[in-house]
Amino acid sequence: MATSANLDIGAQLIVEECPSSYISGMPDIKLEHQLDPNPDEGAAQGVAMGMKFILPNRFDMNVCSRFVKSLNEEDSKNIQDQVNSDLEVASVLFKAECNIHTSPSPGIQVRHVYTPSTTKHFSPIKQSTTLTNKHRGNEVSTTPLLANSLSAHQLAAQGEMLYLATRIEQENVINHTDEEGFTPLMWAAAHGQIAVVEFLLQNGADPQLLGKGRESALSLACSKGYTDIVKMLLDCGVDVNEYDWNGGTPLLYAVHGNHVKCVKMLLENGADPTIETDSGYNSMDLAVALGYRGVQQAIESHLLKLLQNIRE
């Protein structure tokens, strides 16, 4: 099983433990020094295109390479199962649990650890007990008393439109961020609340805002395959190649989640399939390594169209 000590992949994101998930013009990255860093989220701002930072605790993409090379070996089945398990635990999308103390590179800001759940669907966003119960089906109904005690972010995640609208009108918290820099829009996008996302966008929510780890509403939606939300965000003109703290782009997250429709939509809207991780792997490499034939075919088809357009 892969450990957090060899986490080395250029894409990671996203959503199930809720907040308390590129570039065509890469913005400046500020690297903050910390005197007493904790062995947390595994590292700082990701990179894209020509710029590279050495980030500790990142998933080694050689695992993907080993997976591909093993397909023709006699014991490929056992190796494939092991590597699939490695990819699930130390995946592109999720900040892995880290129990090993490392020495971060100078200038790299280290954040606290997000502990993954025992399922394959977990994320860096911490969920409250209320949200956890909702997903487990333990919550029968939401009483006015309970709804009034929830934050705007939790209301957005649960789809409590009426209470959320009232809260925003009274307190003007439509772009308010929690301790991780997540906005109500990001919470709604992460939980597939289509109506809430539409409501927030229509009432002034900023889809361009990023979390402390550069997480975006688009990446959060792509990681779960919420195509309707992805389309709404793309229609707002968000950066389709935005990268997060781990170098992950919306396309890489959609590829990792095997969300073919999202992959096609992103490619049609200018997502760059050639953006590579620090280890030199792009979205096609990841699709092949994970055995996602549908995603692979979607990328191949897009690249062929690009080549045909160039020839014409």
UniProtKB/Swiss-Prot annotation:
Classification via InterPro entries: Ankyrin_rpt, Ankyrin_rpt-contain_sf
Membrane topology, as annotated: Peripheral membrane protein
Pfam family for this entry, one: Ank_2
Localisation per UniProt entry: Cytoplasm, Cytoskeleton; Membrane
GO molecular function: histone deacetylase binding; low-density lipoprotein particle receptor binding; protein kinase binding; ubiquitin protein ligase binding
Protein source organism: Mus musculus
SUPFAM superfamilies for the chain: Ankyrin repeat
Segments annotated as ANK repeats: 147-179, 180-212, 213-245, 246-278, 279-312
Transmembrane segments: none
Gene Ontology process terms (BP): regulation of protein-containing complex assembly
Keyword terms, alphabetized: ANK repeat, Cytoplasm, Cytoskeleton, Membrane, Repeat
Function: May regulate the interaction between the 3M complex and the histone deacetylases HDAC4 and HDAC5. May also regulate LRP2/megalin.
Swiss-Prot/TrEMBL domain comment: The ankyrin repeats, mainly ANK 2, ANK 3 and ANK 4, mediate interaction with a wide array of PxLPxI/L motif-containing proteins including HDAC4 and LRP2. The PxLPxI/L motif of interactors can contain a Ser or a Thr residue in position 2, which phosphorylation prevents the interaction with ANKRA2.
PROSITE patterns, per database record: ANK_REP_REGION, ANK_REPEAT
Record protein name field: Ankyrin repeat family A protein 2
GO cellular component entries: 3M complex; cytoplasm; cytoskeleton; cytosol; membrane; nucleus
Assembly and interaction partners: Interacts (via ANK repeats) with CCDC8 (via PxLPxI/L motif); mediates the interaction with the 3M complex which is composed of CCDC8, CUL7 and OBSL1. Interacts (via ANK repeats) with HDAC4 (via PxLPxI/L motif). Interacts (via ANK repeats) with HDAC5 (via PxLPxI/L motif). Interacts (via ANK repeats) with LRP2/megalin (via PxLPxI/L motif). Interacts (via ANK repeats) with RFX7 (via PxLPxI/L motif). Interacts with AHRR. Interacts with NEK6.
Signal sequence region: none
